[in-house]
Amino acid sequence: MKLSLSPPPYADTPVVVLISGLGGSGSYWLPQLAVLEQEYQVVCYDQRGTGNNPDTLAEDYSIAQMAAELHQALVAAGIEHYAVVGHALGALVGMQLALDYPASVTVLISVNGWLRINAHTRRCFQVRERLLYSGGAQAWVEAQPLFLYPADWMAARAPRLEAEDALALAHFQGKNNLLRRLNALKRADFSHHADRIRCPVQIICASDDLLVPSACSSELHAALPDSQKMVMPYGGHACNVTDPETFNALLLNGLASLLHHREAAL
């Protein structure tokens, strides 16, 4: 699997791995790259079956497989220890990595994540799946911003959204791959395993997230043995895109604090 690695800004730079959500594209993290690359070696990638890592995914594709293939690619790149920043599905992959490779994952940042899928989130995806079956890729792509962004943010950026729609259609991962990745997301359940995650965790959520209620992050916070929770009052599901200034400050402070906390505990 292809990875994109930024040059380390200094010797022994900590590595930060960015894992996007269901869309799978590493470019999702563009608003964070410039600030992160000043302090860390940053790993971005398109998830298997998407973008520049095309593949046909098995029907039983799982979050555990997503975690394993990423870890193997990191080891092949010479990376033994790394912090993880995961958004939604990416946060699930991050938790799986922390469970399966505890010696490798130093810190986890969960952005609008959850323990197991909430009934509201399941309802949102049910509607989106029906759009996919009835209207194809175009209907899926055109509806997607409604679940990602606040209404006023979208209303002020109509040309940008049209350009994003065209790009998403041009690079659509395919119906079968999308549904198999979505099914993996829906099957994931960390409610009985989260207490085994030993790395420090920062939870970031947006109170106005339409797709994943912020209560999901509260449940996650309560289940993890070593976590802190930060709530953004605005930004929607893609809060790192809509309010990068606020998000980046939380992310940078969280990474620095948790990495120091971990080093002090060793």
Swiss-Prot record:
Highest taxon in the source lineage: Bacteria
EC number: 3.5.1.-
InterPro entries membership: AB_hydrolase_1, AB_hydrolase_fold, AB_hydrolase_sf, Pyrimidine_utilisation_RutD
GO molecular function, one term: hydrolase activity, acting on carbon-nitrogen (but not peptide) bonds, in linear amides
Gene Ontology biological process: nitrogen utilization; uracil catabolic process
SUPFAM superfamilies named in the record: alpha/beta-Hydrolases
Entry keyword annotation includes Amino-acid biosynthesis: no
Recorded catalytic activity of this chain's protein: carbamate + 2 H(+) = NH4(+) + CO2
Keywords: Hydrolase
Keyword Hydrolase among record annotations: yes
Pfam families noted in UniProt: Abhydrolase_1 (PF00561)
UniProt cross-references to Gene3D superfamilies, sorted A to Z: alpha/beta hydrolase
Record-stated family: Belongs to the AB hydrolase superfamily. Hydrolase RutD family.
Function: Involved in pyrimidine catabolism. May facilitate the hydrolysis of carbamate, a reaction that can also occur spontaneously.
Cited NCBIfam families: RutD
Protein name, per record: Putative carbamate hydrolase RutD
